[in-house]
Design a protein with these regions (language model features):
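Structural recognition of alpha->loop->beta junctions
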Residues: 117-120, 204-228
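Short, hydrophobic/glycine-enriched beta-strand segments
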Residues: 21-27, 32
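Short glycine-enriched, charge-decorated loop/helix-capping segments at active-site entrances
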Residues: 36-43, 138-144
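Active-site flanking residues adjacent to catalytic metal/cofactor-binding acidic residues
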Residues: 26, 66, 195
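Glycine-rich anion-binding loop/nest that anchors nucleotide
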Residues: 163-176, 195-198
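Histidine-anchored nucleotide/phosphate-binding helix
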Residues: 53, 175-186
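Short, flexible loop segments at boundaries between secondary-structure elements
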Residues: 193-206
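Active-site alpha/beta core segments
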Residues: 48-165
Length: 228
């Protein structure tokens, strides 16, 4: 699929009160940058904009997620004999993409990106630390051996602080950003995606991602208006 040469430009948003809103920055880590173990298309292009948004301190709360896998994680192609990265298998009755080894705990590629001022972050959610289960969403793990998607605790943390609206950005737009936004909407949060502050694994993922966001009632927001 060819990416549209004229990508969606969300309308500029009127000034809004963000004191009851949370910014959720998904997996801004070196292994997802160009040259990294699981590079996202133009992943480094969003770093300055996310840094500016965090420095603006417009949001009542800021959460970052961090992919944090143990060696030998079930999502790694290297954990399955004869399998290659980006192949799909069935795991616990659900489709599972097999990934290159990435974001292994306590390795440089798993760190939060050094080009961002993280001082405004209130909480960091580490995902994928269970060796048996992948974890795309900030809110729930993927399906595990019991056939359920255990919560990460983020939804309760946000509700305890009066948050009813979330803005999601980061990597990858067609995987962890999408799953996080979908879960946020299903859990009752008014949900926005900062499209220009996300990038996909490959541009081929953009059209189905747009369709999924629209289907689930998730809005696109203008990042420039939020950092002004």
């Amino acid at each position: 699929m060819i990416e549209c040469p004229c990508p969606i430009r969300p309308p500029r948003m009127p000034a809004i009160d963000l004191s009851r809103a949370a910014l959720i920055v998904i997996d801004l880590q070196p292994d997802f940058m160009p040259g990294g173990a699981l590079a996202c298309h133009e992943g480094d292009a969003i770093v300055p904009g996310i840094d500016a948004l965090l420095r603006a301190r417009r949001f009542g709360h800021v959460v970052a997620t961090q992919d944090w896998h143990p060696a030998g994680h079930v999502s790694f192609a290297s954990s399955h004999a004869g399998r290659a990265p980006f192949e799909s298998i069935t795991l616990y009755g659900q489709p599972q993409t097999l990934w290159p080894e990435h974001c292994v705990q306590r390795t440089p590629g798993a760190a939060l990106h050094a080009g961002v001022d993280w001082s405004s972050v209130d909480a960091v959610i580490r995902k994928g630390s269970d060796p048996r289960v992948d974890s795309y969403s900030a809110f729930r793990e993927n399906h595990g051996p019991a056939g359920t998607r255990p919560p990460t605790g983020l939804a309760g943390w946000l509700r305890e602080r009066g948050v009813d609206e979330v803005f999601v950005c980061g990597l990858a737009r067609d995987v962890c950003v999408l799953w996080s936004a979908q879960d946020a909407a299903r859990l009752g949060f008014r949900t926005h995606v900062l499209w220009e502050l996300c990038r996909p694994v490959t541009p081929a993922g953009d059209a189905p991602t747009r369709a999924a966001l629209q289907r689930d009632g998730i809005m696109l927001a203008d990042a420039a208006a939020l950092s002004a």
